[in-house]
Amino acid sequence: MYSPPDSVVVDRIQRAFPSDELRERARATNLVERERKFDIVALFYTLSFGFAAGSDRSLQAFLERYVEMAECDELSYSSFHDWFEPGFVALLREILDDAIENLDTGRKDLNGRLERFRDVLIADATIVSLYQDAADVYAATGDNQSELKLHLTESLSTGLPTRFRTTDGKTHERSQLPTGEWVAGALILLDLGFYDFWLFDRIDKNDGWFVSRVKDDANFEIVEELRTWRGNSIPLEGESLQDVLDDLQRQEIDVQITLSFDRKRGSGASATRTFRLVGLLNEETGEYHLYLTNLGRD
């Protein structure tokens, strides 16, 4: 995949975040008046180009990069540490929010099989390791660690996020993807972090579409075959998925399955839905990649 030269990336970021605008925003805070060595431009670009992309993500490494970029003689660790207060965090959030709002979306119409959808939305999450002092706010799954989790839904037509949120590293992806009218007419692509039968049902009930990976141990009841095979193929109707999966050799599985889930969270009342299960054979491993969807064969 093509990657632009570093100089091109730097130029794009500098045009998106002009130095004069950064300084003007910083003057609205009390950091500039209180801290003589505070240089918002050097600090912002250090964060953009050096600290987050480097292998050493300690605050000390960040300080060293900042001193180099700001060309200041020296700066104590304690003074640098004190800059990271709620006011500075709010400033960074304001800069990011305005940048996203002012981006030229360059929306492209979906073509071919995708033109039937209002949009194709990809939901995912990623972990960012933080300085350990932040563990009280951004807890991690491991001990003595701090993690931030970014939850993002991206539009295929624009290449931009439609919604995003940050939480601590322990927060599960599924809890950060609401359902509602926003899914109507859109195809939602989901990874295993969003594997939830109740979620699939809500997307379908709100006139949306979904494609989700399936867990390895999923054992649905097959109620109908949507594609027939010639020869002595194994009949699947009425079988449980795990009972027949290892014996199949066909290139593709295309069946209707049933699944059960709680109709309302914690209510104990169950519901049963029928969805489509598609499997594609990986000839190198001999195993199937399985997907669950409410899309029809057309």
Descriptions of predicted regions:
Residues A70:
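Adenosine ribonucleotide-centric catalytic and binding domains
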